[in-house]
C-alpha cells in the first residue's frame, strides 16, 4: 500500500522555508525548542478565532521575534494595539527573553491550506454536510487562482458506524514534483460522533529558482520612486 511523504517536510530548503529559523549550541537547543513549542501552543489557544495560518519564530541576539500570519489581523492587534501588547508580554515570559511580535496579513485565505482546513472543520462542527463543505472549499480555491486542490475528510462521516475516508479533487496536485508549490495542512473536527480528520493540499504553481525565489517573493515590494519632471525654461 503506497504511503505519502509529508509534502512540506520533503520540500524544506527546496521551496519551503522553516517555521523556526535560529541556531543554537547543544546546551541551548532543547530549551529553545521547548519554548518554541510552548509559544506556539499559547498563541494558537489565545488566537483560536483569529484565523492563524502559521507562526514563524526567529531568535536574533538574546531575543525572540514572532511573526503571526493571519487572515484577521484586527483581532490579533486589538483596540489600539492592546491585545498584541498583552501577547508580547506573555511570549517574553514564556521564552525568558525580550519579545517582538509582527503581524502578517494573509491576503487570500481561500488559498491557504491551514485556513481552508479550519474552515471545513468549523462547518463540520456546525453539522453542515461534509460533501457540501468540501465542494465549497474546492470551488473557492479554484476561483481564487489555485492550479489544483485536494480535500480529504475521514472518520465517522454522517454518523456512520464504520469510519471511512472521502476525498474530492480538482485540477492537478503533483506530489512528486519538488519545485511544485504545494501547501499542505490538517485540522480536526470534534463532533458528537467522534473526531473527523481533514487534510488539504493546494497546488499554486511551480517555483523556479528555489529558496532564493521564495525569499524574494516574501519580501515586501519596494515602492518605485517618483521621477521629478524637469520644467521647460
From Swiss-Prot:
Pfam families from the UniProt entry: KH_2, Ribosomal_S3_C
PANTHER family per UniProt: 30S/40S RIBOSOMAL PROTEIN S3, SMALL RIBOSOMAL SUBUNIT PROTEIN US3C
UniProt keyword Ribonucleoprotein present: yes
Purpose of the protein: Binds the lower part of the 30S subunit head. Binds mRNA in the 70S ribosome, positioning it for translation.
Name the record gives this protein: Small ribosomal subunit protein uS3
SMART domains assigned to the protein according to its UniProt record, in alphabetical order: KH (SM00322)
Domain KH type-2: start-end pairs: 39-107
GO CC field: cytosolic small ribosomal subunit
Gene Ontology biological process terms from the UniProt entry: translation
Molecular function in Gene Ontology: mRNA binding; rRNA binding; structural constituent of ribosome
Organism: Photorhabdus laumondii subsp. laumondii (strain DSM 15139 / CIP 105565 / TT01)
Protein keywords: Ribonucleoprotein, Ribosomal protein, RNA-binding, rRNA-binding
Subunit structure: Part of the 30S ribosomal subunit. Forms a tight complex with proteins S10 and S14.
Gene3D superfamilies: 3.30.300.20, Ribosomal protein S3, C-terminal domain
NCBIfam families for this protein: rpsC_bact (TIGR01009)
Family statement drawn from the similarity comment of this UniProt entry: Belongs to the universal ribosomal protein uS3 family.
Amino acid at each position: 500500500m503506497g504511503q505519502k511523504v509529508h509534502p512540506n517536510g520533503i520540500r524544506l530548503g527546496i521551496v519551503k522555508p522553516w517555521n523556526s529559523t535560529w541556531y543554537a549550541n547543544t546546551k541551548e537547543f532543547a530549551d529553545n525548542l521547548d519554548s518554541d513549542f510552548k509559544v506556539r501552543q499559547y498563541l494558537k489557544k489565545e488566537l483560536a478565532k483569529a484565523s492563524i495560518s502559521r507562526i514563524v519564530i526567529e531568535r536574533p541576539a538574546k531575543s525572540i521575534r514572532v511573526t503571526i500570519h493571519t487572515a484577521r489581523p484586527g483581532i490579533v492587534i486589538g483596540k489600539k494595539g492592546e491585545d498584541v501588547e498583552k501577547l508580547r508580554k506573555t511570549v517574553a515570559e514564556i521564552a525568558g527573553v525580550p519579545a517582538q511580535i509582527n503581524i502578517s496579513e494573509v491576503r487570500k485565505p481561500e488559498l491557504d491550506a491551514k485556513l481552508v482546513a479550519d474552515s471545513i472543520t468549523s462547518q463540520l462542527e456546525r453539522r453542515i454536510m461534509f460533501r457540501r463543505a468540501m465542494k465549497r472549499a474546492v470551488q473557492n480555491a479554484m476561483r481564487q487562482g489555485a492550479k489544483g486542490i485536494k480535500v480529504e475528510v475521514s472518520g465517522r462521516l454522517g454518523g456512520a458506524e464504520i469510519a471511512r475516508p472521502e476525498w474530492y479533487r480538482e485540477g492537478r496536485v503533483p506530489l512528486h514534483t519538488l519545485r511544485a508549490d504545494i501547501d499542505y495542512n490538517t485540522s480536526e473536527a470534534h463532533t458528537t460522533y467522534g473526531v473527523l480528520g481533514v487534510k488539504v493540499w493546494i497546488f499554486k504553481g511551480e517555483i523556479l529558482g528555489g529558496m532564493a525565489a521564495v525569499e524574494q517573493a516574501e519580501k515586501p515590494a519596494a515602492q518605485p520612486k517618483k521621477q521629478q519632471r524637469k520644467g521647460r525654461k
